[in-house]
């Protein structure tokens, strides 16, 4: 073995990239790391602080904006699907540090359904089957990986060496036993050549089982192929010898490493640590830890977590506490710890997992209401014994880490249908005095109800009785009665099993059940004898069903009269008239038109009996009933219902070309004849100016001074400025002022005067011109501000300090330009040009103090670093850190060191604990390097940011390849490709195409499948005669106007070209059409489109223009045209925007066009890139059906989707808010009533509370407070949907004039006032509406309750009080709103 390793010295020297990813540092099975296979680092280096699992970094890639070039449909679709999958997995990893099996399964199924998955998608899925699945056993993970491999291979994915390497990595992470020789044979059979990464992982596979002989064979292969032996190999051999029982040789590996020229790093020591931990040798572990502490190396939290796993897995949990004491628990390491906890529990080491959990710290400002929830949920999934899980819950609560641990566990148990666990937890909660509510049992009852399991129902009722919970009406009606033949048999069964309570709840449930079955006589008897208050609204839906199933009109009338006149049933608002009116409306609305027609006579009789009983209904409800009767084609009944209207409460309710000599002769002749010369004089002056004949122009002006006008002076001033004639320019300006003090020159002439006067040190005159611009409100455009910059920069380059300072001060003070970083550059430049670095730094700092900008700080720092000005560097960094934060300071210093070639110092900066990627800043430096061809600096940036947390590695290498392409350096590009593989980077398709282009240009083989991009030039071939130079300029002018958003000017150019029969490119027409559509110039856009289609073969609009066209067609109600546009765009494989498709669907719904909506649904099926939620179709199809009076069909479809066992949409995402809102806005009362019934049924029968909560919130938002209150009374569980209510409050608080809505919500659900998110939203809304009184009341209420108020809440309240001139009763938080928003967001996102 030593003989194989000693020659590694020269191999290592030849290695282009000796490092391996950090992901190769974990022992097998631990989340995020492999078995003792260690990352190679430079001597003394450590991974950047803040990094997570390396696999997590695979997904931390910022979604790219698509290239401007249009991609063909197959490529674009494949790429967009990859981005979608990446986004889903990335979000999960960012949020939790792991991936769930369900999410990975959904992404896998979506990938397969695309029909043409790509190699990148395969790589992404395979790499997700390892340690990112801590909630799955090792065998399940590997089985999943094999399933993905086989399925994608069937679908035609071509695997390359990166896929085999990914599979190897999964095997190692999952401790999968396999034959490395068979694996190599499999690769050979697929004609895939192994690379260095393959051999390194095969060595790790042998070493994991202690097979040193096998590892030696692979080392031999590597030697013959001249592959470098990296530290990862040495570290694997440490593990191999240890697992072979040879600890002496394991430790000797460190000596061999030194002989090979490598100083063992912390990764190698970590491998040795794990080896001793697996043997339970705590003494050796302590010695290694002590040795590393005394060296330049250090261990990170995640390293200690590996050691904990090694001890636990080997059966030595007694040493875990000692290792836990060494962990610092930095924020970035929390996800690693959480994943270790989950995996320990999965491996039946839940006690150790709980020990680690208890050691985790609470994040800053954490509310202690969800700490450890992830662990408890996983324990429920693993079906741990109830007594153990309850013990965990109590220990968490006693440690004040999770205030509602038992409640949360109960929630998980009910969701997972763990009856025994749920019962045990409920009993524990009851013992502690926590109220157990009936709806907690509904998920358990629902399963038995579906199978008509009477004994199961009885068992659950017994459990309810045992834990002291009385079933409510909904429980009986929805879950108990349906399992029996009659109410009597229910009563008998409950009595027999001693489950019938003495309260009236069961009797009231019986009444509802009788109503449902049409037994009206029993209902009447009950209502007459009832002594308890009973709400009419709670009976309404049931009575409607009862009335329809019984045709005894006398009973109809008697029940209605009783409910109308008896105060027990209509004592609450809105009163008896409204209650009966809505009941009649809903009764008729519940019937079909044929049913109403068949029962016309009985309804007439019913109305007349009500009249005799003196029952009244309001006028507005009467009108609604009339509309219904007209719709049902029974207008004859209107006169019969009219007699019920309460009349006492009725209320009712957009020159030809000439030479200068000719003009001068004409001018003299006119003067001699005594005729006006103004026009000719102006024409002559303009001509001389155009000829740049300043001397002659000034002579003409002097000769005819008495005849001069403002326009002539303006032209002369501009001419003198162009000729750098400050004296005459200033004199002419003074003459203009004497002639007409109110005259205003155009902006360009003022700017020209400032420039020439400043250049000639006439600062006061220049400042006076600036003051005049301000006084006369001269138009300041972006081009004007740019001109100011050039004036200042010119003075700076000339070294004119005072000129720069005074002109800048005047420009900014007068408000002619904002004090931006760009306009302030010259203040620093003037000192840099003079080499005065202290003054340059002071100028930059002064700008920040005065204007909050820090111009040219990078250039100043670079100069200071070059000169070695340590004191000034420290001063600069202290200032930046104080004003812009430590992270900004670190990046400034990092870039300065990179720019100046101080790479060791740059490395130290980027490895600072806690630093994380800032994509915008990194891209800024990349662009700077590319623009100035700084290859070495960019290469070092890419190298040093390898371990930077959340760094988009593909983006970094893409920038590097762009630079290599400029220099045609294919060798470096190829080396970059090797490094990308070693880092396990999943390249985007654009990166692969760029690399392939570099290699092909240099006649090199491309080692991967190149994603194809088909595109053609549809520019019409025009002969030279038809495209003159002048016409080309016209096209450029048109595009220039488009860029400036000048739609009218651009369209006029098009008209001119059209007359001349000049044809532009299709891109130009698409751009013009898009601009016209954005300006809502629909007719003109269609004109351009028609012309392009008739003159360019195959002309089509691009995605963006077609999307705009659809939106404009919808706005004009051209729905058929919009549908045709959408179909054409999809046929061209374009991807229309989400808003365009959504607006078309919504417009079709309001027209009741179900067929067209379903056609769109078929058209966009599989196009996940549009981002259309399935709820868009569900909501709008239902709305369209309701518009067609097909209410029952709409309700049935929604109910089926909600209650189906194979739900396409998870219940928590099944949002019906849009449907409810439109039904309320369109005043579709029958539909609203049926939706209300359906929503309540879903809540009562299936414990699905989102629909009824959405309805409640829409009623509140639309001002229907009474209806909302009644709904809340019927379904009290709405008040417990805290997450939905919080989201509603957040969205509402962002809209003006919505404070009353939030007030109403808090009145209906008072307990929300103590929710920190809700009261923060309330204050935000009050501040937005300037509602000081409400804000004061809220503040006083919260302070009286001694609730902790965050700084953002206090900042908003203080700002509101200051706006109205009232004193602030507390010290105002000093930072900006943005600061506190970010602070609060980070606090809430902190994992617990």
UniProtKB/Swiss-Prot annotation:
PROSITE patterns, per the entry: PPR (PS51375)
Positions of modified residues (N6-acetyllysine): 151, 186, 225, 291, 462, 749
Keyword set, alphabetical order: Acetylation, Autophagy, DNA-binding, Membrane, Mitochondrion, mRNA transport, Nucleus, Phosphoprotein, Repeat, RNA-binding, Transcription, Transcription regulation, Transit peptide, Transport
Reported tissue expression: Strongly expressed in heart, liver and kidney. Weakly expressed in brain, skeletal muscle and testes.
Subcellular localization: Mitochondrion; Nucleus; Nucleus, Nucleoplasm; Nucleus inner membrane
First and last residues of every PPR repeat: 125-159, 160-194, 195-229, 230-264, 265-299, 300-334, 402-436, 437-471, 677-708, 709-745, 746-783, 784-820, 821-856, 953-987, 1030-1064, 1065-1101, 1102-1136, 1137-1175, 1176-1210, 1315-1349
Targeting presequence: 1-59
Residues carrying Phosphoserine: 1025-1026, 1028, 1137
A Pfam family matched in the record: PPR_3
A GO-annotated cellular component: mitochondrial nucleoid
Function: May play a role in RNA metabolism in both nuclei and mitochondria. In the nucleus binds to HNRPA1-associated poly(A) mRNAs and is part of nmRNP complexes at late stages of mRNA maturation which are possibly associated with nuclear mRNA export. Positively modulates nuclear export of mRNAs containing the EIF4E sensitivity element (4ESE) by binding simultaneously to both EIF4E and the 4ESE and acting as a platform for assembly for the RNA export complex. Also binds to exportin XPO1/CRM1 to engage the nuclear pore and traffic the bound mRNAs to the cytoplasm.
Description of how the protein assembles with itself and partners: Component of mRNP complexes associated with HNRPA1. Component of the complex, at least composed of LRPPRC, BECN1 and BCL2; the interactions prevent BECN1 from forming an autophagy-inducing complex with PIK3C3. Interacts with CECR2, HEBP2, MAP1S and UXT. Interacts with PPARGC1A. Interacts with FOXO1. Interacts (via N-terminus) with EIF4E; the interaction promotes association of EIF4E with 4ESE-containing mRNAs. Interacts with exportin XPO1/CRM1; interacts both alone and in complex with EIF4E and 4ESE-containing mRNAs to form an EIF4E-dependent mRNA export complex.
Designated name of the protein: Leucine-rich PPR motif-containing protein, mitochondrial
């Amino acid at each position: 073995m030593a003989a194989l390793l000693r020659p590694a010295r020269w191999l290592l020297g030849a290695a282009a990239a000796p490092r391996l990813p950090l992901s190769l540092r974990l022992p097998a099975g631990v989340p995020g790391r492999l078995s003792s296979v260690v990352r190679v680092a430079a001597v003394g280096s450590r991974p950047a602080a803040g990094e997570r699992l390396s696999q997590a970094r695979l997904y931390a890639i910022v979604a790219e904006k698509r290239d401007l070039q249009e991609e063909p449909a197959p490529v674009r679709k494949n790429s967009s699907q990859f981005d979608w999958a990446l986004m889903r997995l990335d979000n999960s990893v960012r949020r939790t540090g792991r991936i769930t099996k369900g999410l990975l399964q959904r992404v896998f199924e979506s990938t397969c359904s695309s029909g043409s998955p790509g190699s990148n998608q395969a790589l992404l899925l395979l790499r997700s089957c390892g340690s990112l699945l801590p909630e799955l056993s090792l065998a399940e993970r590997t089985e999943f990986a094999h399933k993905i491999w086989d399925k994608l291979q069937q679908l035609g994915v071509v695997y390359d060496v990166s896929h085999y390497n990914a599979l190897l990595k999964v095997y190692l992470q999952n401790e999968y036993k396999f034959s490395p020789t068979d694996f190599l044979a499999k690769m050979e059979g697929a004609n895939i050549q192994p690379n260095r990464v393959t051999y390194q992982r095969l060595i790790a596979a042998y070493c994991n089982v202690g097979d040193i002989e096998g590892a030696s064979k692979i080392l031999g292969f590597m030697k013959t192929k001249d592959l470098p032996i990296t530290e990862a190999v040495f570290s694997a051999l440490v593990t191999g010898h240890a697992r072979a029982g040879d600890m002496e040789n394991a430790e000797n590996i460190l000596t061999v490493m030194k002989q090979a020229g490598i100083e063992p790093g912390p990764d190698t020591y970590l491998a040795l640590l794990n080896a001793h931990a697996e043997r339970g040798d705590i003494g050796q572990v302590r010695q290694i830890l002590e040795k590393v502490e005394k060296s330049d190396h250090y261990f990170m939290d995640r390293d200690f977590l590996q050691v904990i796993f090694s001890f636990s897995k080997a059966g030595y949990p007694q040493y875990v506490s000692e290792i836990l004491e060494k962990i610092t628990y930095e924020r970035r390491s929390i996800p690693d710890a959480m994943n270790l906890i989950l995996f320990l529990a999965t491996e039946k080491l839940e006690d150790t997992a709980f020990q680690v959990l208890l050691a985790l710290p609470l994040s800053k400002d954490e509310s202690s209401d969800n700490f450890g929830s992830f662990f408890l949920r996983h324990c429920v999934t693993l079906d741990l014994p109830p007594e153990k899980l309850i013990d965990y819950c109590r220990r968490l609560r006693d440690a004040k880490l999770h205030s509602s641990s038992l409640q949360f566990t109960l929630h998980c148990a009910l969701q997972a249908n763990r009856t025994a666990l749920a019962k045990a937890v409920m009993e524990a909660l009851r013992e502690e005095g926590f109220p157990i509510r009936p709806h907690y049992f509904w998920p358990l009852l629902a399963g038995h109800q579906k199978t008509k399991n009477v004994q199961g129902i009885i068992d659950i009722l017994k459990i309810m009785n045992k834990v002291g919970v009385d079933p409510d009406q909904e429980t009986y009606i929805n879950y108990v009665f349906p399992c029996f033949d009659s109410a009597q048999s229910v009563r008998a069964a409950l009595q027999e099993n001693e489950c019938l309570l003495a309260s009236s709840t069961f009797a009231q449930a019986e009444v509802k059940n009788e109503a449902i079955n049409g037994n009206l006589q029993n209902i009447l008897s009950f209502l007459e004898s009832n002594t308890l208050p009973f709400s009419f609204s709670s009976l309404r839906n049931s009575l409607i069903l009862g009335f329809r199933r019984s045709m005894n009109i006398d009973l109809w009338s008697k029940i209605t009269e009783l409910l109308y006149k008896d105060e027990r049933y209509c004592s609450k608002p809105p009163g008896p008239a409204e209650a009966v009116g809505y009941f009649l409306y809903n009764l008729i609305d519940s019937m079909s038109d044929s049913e109403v027609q068949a029962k016309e006579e009985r309804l007439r009789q019913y109305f007349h009996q009500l009249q005799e009983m003196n029952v009244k209904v309001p006028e507005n409800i009467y009108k609604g009933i009339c509309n219904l009767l007209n719709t049902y084609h029974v207008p004859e009944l209107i006169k019969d219902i009219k007699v019920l209207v309460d009349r006492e409460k009725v209320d009712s309710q957009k020159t030809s070309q000439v030479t200068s000599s000719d003009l001068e002769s004409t001018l003299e002749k006119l003067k001699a004849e005594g005729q006006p010369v103004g026009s000719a004089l102006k024409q002559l002056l303009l001509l001389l100016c155009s000829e740049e004949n300043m001397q002659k122009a000034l002579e003409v002006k002097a000769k005819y001074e008495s005849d001069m006008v403002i326009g002539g002076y303006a032209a002369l001033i501009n001419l003198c400025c162009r000729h750098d004639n400050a004296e005459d320019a200033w004199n002419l300006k003074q003459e203009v002022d004497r002639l007409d003090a109110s005259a205003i020159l155009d902006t360009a002439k003022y700017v020209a005067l400032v420039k020439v006067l400043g250049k000639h040190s006439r600062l006061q005159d220049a400042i006076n011109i600036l003051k005049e611009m301000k006084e006369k409100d001269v138009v300041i455009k972006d081009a004007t501000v740019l001109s100011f910059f050039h004036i200042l920069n010119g003075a700076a380059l000339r070294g004119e300090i005072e000129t720069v300072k005074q002109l800048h001060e005047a420009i900014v003070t007068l408000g002619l330009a904002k004090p931006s970083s760009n306009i302030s550059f010259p203040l620093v430049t003037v000192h840099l040009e003079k080499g005065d670095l202290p003054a340059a730094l002071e100028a930059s700092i002064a700008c920040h103090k005065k204007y909050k900008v820090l111009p040219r700080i990078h250039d100043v720092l670079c100069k200071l670093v070059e000169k070695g000005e340590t004191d000034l560097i420290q001063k600069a960094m202290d200032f930046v850190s104080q004003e812009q934060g430590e992270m900004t300071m670190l990046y400034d210093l990092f870039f300065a060191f990179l720019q100046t070639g101080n790479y060791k110092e740059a490395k130290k900066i980027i490895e600072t604990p806690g630093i994380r990627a800032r994509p915008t800043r990194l891209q800024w430096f990349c662009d700077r390097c590319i623009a100035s061809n700084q290859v070495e600096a960019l290469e070092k940036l890419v190298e040093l940011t390898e371990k930077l947390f959340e760094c988009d590695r593909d983006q970094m290498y893409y920038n590097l390849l762009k630079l290599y392409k400029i220099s045609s350096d294919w060798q470096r590009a190829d080396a970059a490709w090797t490094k990308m593989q070693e880092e396990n980077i999943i390249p985007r398709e654009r990166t692969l195409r760029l690399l392939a282009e570099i290699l092909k240009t240099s006649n090199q083989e491309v080692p991967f499948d190149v994603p194809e991009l088909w595109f053609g030039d549809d520019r019409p071939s025009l002969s030279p005669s038809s495209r003159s130079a002048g016409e080309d300029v016209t096209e450029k002018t048109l595009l220039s106007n488009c860029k400036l958003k000048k739609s009218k000017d651009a369209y006029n150019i098009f008209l001119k070209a059209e007359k001349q029969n000049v044809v532009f490119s299709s891109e130009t027409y698409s751009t013009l059409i898009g601009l016209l559509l954005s300006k809502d110039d629909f007719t003109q856009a269609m004109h351009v489109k028609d012309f392009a289609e008739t003159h360019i073969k195959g002309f089509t609009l691009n995605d963006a223009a077609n999307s705009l066209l659809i939106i404009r067609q919808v706005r004009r109600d051209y729905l058929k045209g919009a549908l045709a546009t959408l179909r054409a765009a999809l046929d061209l494989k374009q991807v229309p925007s989400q808003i365009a498709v959504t607006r078309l669907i919504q417009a079709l719904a309001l027209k009741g066009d179900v067929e067209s909506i379903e056609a769109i649904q078929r058209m966009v099926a599989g196009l996940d890139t549009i981002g259309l939620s399935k709820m868009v179709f569900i909501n709008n199809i239902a709305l369209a059906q309701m518009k067609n009076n097909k209410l029952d069909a709409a309700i049935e479809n929604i109910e089926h989707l909600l209650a189906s066992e194979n739900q396409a949409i998870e219940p928590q995402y099944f949002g019906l808010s849009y449907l409810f809102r439109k039904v309320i806005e369109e005043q579709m009362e029958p539909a609203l009533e049926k939706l209300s019934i359906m929503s309540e049924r879903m809540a009562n029968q299936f414990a699905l509370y989102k629909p009824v909560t959405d309805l409640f919130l829409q009623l509140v938002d639309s001002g229907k407070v009474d209806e909302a209150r009644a709904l809340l009374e019927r379904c009290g569980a709405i008040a417990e949907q805290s997450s939905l209510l919080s989201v509603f409050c957040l969205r509402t608080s962002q809209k003006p004039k919505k404070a009353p809505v939030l007030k109403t919500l808090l009145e209906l659900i008072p307990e929300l006032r103590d929710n920190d998110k809700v009261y923060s939203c309330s204050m935000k809304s009050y501040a937005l509406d300037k509602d000081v009184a409400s804000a004061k009341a809220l503040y006083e209420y919260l302070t009286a309750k001694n609730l902790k108020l965050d700084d953002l809440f206090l900042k908003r309240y203080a700002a509101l009080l200051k706006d109205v001139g009232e004193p602030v009763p507390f010290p105002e938080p000093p930072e900006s709103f943005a600061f506190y928003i970010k602070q609060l967001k980070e606090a809430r996102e902190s994992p617990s």
